């Protein structure tokens, strides 16, 4: 694995907060926007296990995702495209570790403990998910129109 490219991807991901996750199910493709945190190059998030994307991950773990800031100048386009597999984190120690990453990144998650009952209950029902990328493409038009670098991840 190209360590320099991996580091640039990690730095970019750390500067962003929303990914668009694409899943597949009986009704076709589905995309959803999610807050995320990183564990190296793995993306972590929480979701209702009964949400459409969560159910689709349980049925078929193959996913794709993009992370990109909004911009109006094509030369400023930067982002990543990922494909790999997603799964629900079931090991208690791993779940606690990943929740810690998310709560460290997003203050509103820490504040839910003192928030309204409905929000606390909804958060308590969430499941932790992890995307293990197989490949990541870093896009950076500041390096030239359509500039892309691919990082293959060894399983």
Language-model segments: which ranges?
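Extreme N-terminal tail/first-helix region
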Residues: 1-18
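A generic structural signal for nonpolar/aromatic side chains embedded in well-ordered alpha-helices
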Residues: 13, 56-57, 102
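Structured helix-beta-strand junction loops
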Residues: 15-16, 59-60, 134
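Short Pro/Gly-enriched beta-strand edge/turn motifs at strand-loop
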Residues: 15-20, 109-113
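Short beta-strand segments
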Residues: 16-49, 55, 64-69, 77-81
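Short acidic (Asp/Glu) patches
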Residues: 48-51, 64-69, 105-117
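Short, surface-exposed beta-strand-loop junctions and turns on beta-sheet-rich folds
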Residues: 51-53, 72, 144-146
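Charged, gly/pro-rich active-site loop segments
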Residues: 78-155
């Amino acid at each position: 694995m190209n360590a320099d490219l991996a580091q640039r991807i990690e730095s970019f991901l750390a500067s962003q907060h929303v990914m668009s996750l694409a899943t597949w199910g009986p009704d076709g493709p589905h995309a959803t926007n999610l807050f995320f945190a990183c564990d190296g190059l793995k993306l972590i998030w929480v979701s209702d296990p009964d949400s459409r994307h969560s159910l689709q991950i349980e049925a078929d773990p193959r996913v794709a995702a993009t992370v990109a800031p909004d911009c109006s100048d094509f030369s400023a386009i930067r982002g990543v495209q990922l494909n790999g597999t997603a799964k629900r984190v079931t090991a208690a120690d791993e779940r606690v570790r990943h929740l810690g990453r998310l709560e460290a990144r997003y203050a509103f998650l820490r504040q839910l403990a003192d928030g309204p009952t409905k929000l606390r209950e909804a958060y308590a029902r969430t499941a932790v998910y992890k995307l293990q990328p197989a490949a990541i493409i870093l896009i950076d038009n500041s390096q030239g129109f359509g500039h892309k670098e691919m990082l293959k991840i060894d399983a």
